[in-house]
Every structure is written in C-alpha cells, then in structure tokens.
Amino acid sequence: FSFRNIEEARKVLPENSSYWKSLDGMWKFHWAPNPDERPKDFFRTDYDVSKWDDIKVPVSWNMAGLQRDGKNKYGDPLYSNQRVIFQHSWQPMNDWKGGVMRTPPKDWMTYRNRNEVGSYRRTFNVPADWKGQEIYLNFDGVDSFFYLYINGKYVGFSKNSRNLAQFDITPYLNKKGENV
C-alpha cells in the first residue's frame, strides 16, 4: 500500500494514508431472489437506479432487509449453529442430510433462497492529487461470487467468499469527474 510520506507510513494502517479512500456508506441496491430476476444491464452508466433502495455498506443484505413487521425485504437470514453447513463427504444418500450439491426440501428456507443476487451501485470521484498513481479497489469480504464493473466496463470477478479481493481500476477511471 502506498503512503505519501514517512509520517503516514509510520501509522501503518491504510486509512492513515492520504492515498486511501473508503467507499463505505450509502449505495444503491437491488435484491433479486434468483439470477433470472436480476437487472442484467445495471452496470451500464446510463442504467436508471433511482428507484433502487439505499443500503449502508458494509452490511449483510438479509439483516438490512428486516422490517418492523417481522418480514424481510431481502431474503431470509440463515443462521447455523454448526461449524460446517455443507456436506463434506461424498457418500450416496437416500435422504436429505444437507450438502451443497443437493436440493433441499421445498418447505426449507434454503429452498426458497438458494441463489439470491444483490446488485450494488455507487458513484465516486478520484481525488485530484492522486494524479499519476495506480488506483486499487479492495473488497474486504464479499459473501460470495461477484463481478466488478467501473464506468460500464468489466474489471473482473472474485469467487473467494469473505476474503480480500483487489482490483487495479486505474485504466477504467474518469480521472476528472464522477465514476460509476
């Protein structure tokens, strides 16, 4: 990670650098119960997200969707009091005992919400004094697979759930003005 000077570097944490900017805060958000119902072209810069919800990031969308009446706007939070929630032995089974490769019973919450999709959108500006710097975007723990687009262009993807994902976004940025 880059620091502007020795004083910043001695503080060690990235957020102490003037080359660090957090994108935590309010984002536009759309939830879909499955991939077929997701907004397919939302990465386009002209896509209208004005009717999408506002959601504070970072957050679990399932928890953010809890309503006062007890219903959930964004799927159901899934709690497991077991260390491993997926089957990790490959043995033939005649009944459902869990497992990532099996279809759960229809009355289970995991049947209804097997592959939810959250689409996020945020605008930001690059500080003028970052001119000439490489700019990286870090995601510190997305819960699943995701694609990243900047200004309508595909940047990359990550499938490492809850791990750091880092992207060099320098070539995709508008250095003067807003980025989507």
Q: Which residue ranges define each predicted feature?
A:
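Accessory carbohydrate-binding/adhesion or oligomerization-edge regions at the termini
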Residues: 1-99, 155
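Accessory beta-strand-rich segments of carbohydrate-active enzymes
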Residues: 13-14, 30-32, 38, 63-64, ...
